[in-house]
Amino acid sequence: MESSSECSSISDFQDSTEGDDANTLPENLCMREYVVICDYVATDNTQLSLCSGDKVLLLNAVSQDWWWVNHNGTCGYVPASHLHDALNEQEDTEVNDPWQDEEYYGSYKTLKLHLEMLSDVPRTMTYQNVILKNSSSLCGKHILDLGCGTGIISFFCAKFAQPEAVYAVEASKIAEQTCRLVEQNGISSLVHVIRQQAEELDLPTKVDVLVSEWMGTCLLFEFMLESVLQARDRWLKEDGVMWPSTACIHLVPCSAYKEYSNKVLFWDNPYQLDFSLLKPPATKEFFAKPQPDYILQPEDCLSEPCTLFHLNLKTLQVAELERMNCDFTFLVHTNGLLHGFTAWFSVQFENLEEQGHLELNTGPFSPLTHWKHTLFMLDEPLQVQKRDKISGSVVFERNSVWRRHMSVTLSWVISRELKMQKVGCKVFPIWR
Ligand SMILES: N=C(N)NC/C=C/[C@H]1O[C@@H](n2cnc3c(N)ncnc32)[C@H](O)[C@@H]1O
């Protein structure tokens, strides 16, 4: 596991931060007992292998990511994410639930997020168009609307098509409101609201269509996709339809001068004072994680975007989500500053009644959606010019402990006329 600062690896990070107070956590965290919440297998002789439930004594929190502990007389490094403060035991539901379901479903029980999603016209109208354009194919069919929220997709099915039944499955408390909406609109003989986690679902029959709006930041965050794939394997007929049918993640190198100026250059001379020593901590504080609500302007793209991953949701396996990596090469088409990379996703819906497919694209060349764009800022901007090449790789790695979270590792090489100019690498947690 690497730290979140650029070009560092754990061994460099350990050497450079040994006894470095700037990186140790407050003393009050040390000399306390911690419980291991997830097995860990050491990857070198400075680390300890531990099992879930082991108790350790924290000796030195050398960084946010790695802690030096004593376990039954043996000392070594373990990932801090695998430890929980045994003396300050939170509710079991919080600590022992790597899916954080109580917090997760709690966030969907109020109207805030549902209002945001329903207010997203490109998102919601895409689903309406999919139902509209396939209405005759849906006649007499069984449909599963997974994570239905307020039931909007199920309402579209009842309003624009004549399916046999729609199973509107929703685990959060909002399902109580969804029930009332379905009754009030007189469609309860067609739309069956089931307040249940999809994983525990019991339906009277397999379904012809599994439709869901499961996409999170960078497509995968929340990993609701795992629930969708499990429901596919359990409830979708062999020749059934997945909507969305495919999903893509796109990336482009970009300038983000205003972001960099507002968050870092600001410290050069606020009110004509030199606060520039705050620029490094500002960079770490504001750019260690991606900005999930960034709006990339098309003119800030430094090259054509590329498609990193193209997922087929009829065949994708949950295990493939653990780690996905892809190489990329961008040909810079504009002189400028490379401040970072921006990512977004698109999803495609197979059309059952004519050639082609419908698409919801959340990128900078399509109508803005509530997902906006995800900006990965480098620690330092890099000068690039037309015809430079930015090649490298990206790794999406699912968090082995917190199962709704992931990290994105970006590695890049900037070359000019075949001569290597700049090399870099940075790990971005989303969000743990
Ligand atoms: N599109 C975004 N960002 N969020 C996805 C939308 C999430 C909605 O789906 C529900 N949901 C998520 N996972 C499950 C599950 N396994 N079983 C039943 N309901 C579920 C949540 O409570 C939200 O209402």
UniProtKB/Swiss-Prot annotation:
One of the entry's Gene Ontology molecular-function terms is: histone methyltransferase activity
Mention one GO biological process in which this protein takes part, according to its record. negative regulation of DNA-templated transcription
Name the keywords, alphabetized: Cytoplasm, Methyltransferase, Nucleus, S-adenosyl-L-methionine, SH3 domain, Transferase
Q: Where is this region: Disordered?
A: 1-22
Give one Pfam hit by family name.
PRMT_C
Its UniProt entry gives the catalysed reaction(s) as: L-arginyl-[protein] + 2 S-adenosyl-L-methionine = N(omega),N(omega)-dimethyl-L-arginyl-[protein] + 2 S-adenosyl-L-homocysteine + 2 H(+)
Segments of skewed composition (Low complexity):
1-11
- Active site at E213, E222
Q: Report the sequence similarity comment from the record.
A: Belongs to the class I-like SAM-binding methyltransferase superfamily. Protein arginine N-methyltransferase family.
This one is known as Protein arginine N-methyltransferase 2
> Which gene underlies this protein?
prmt2
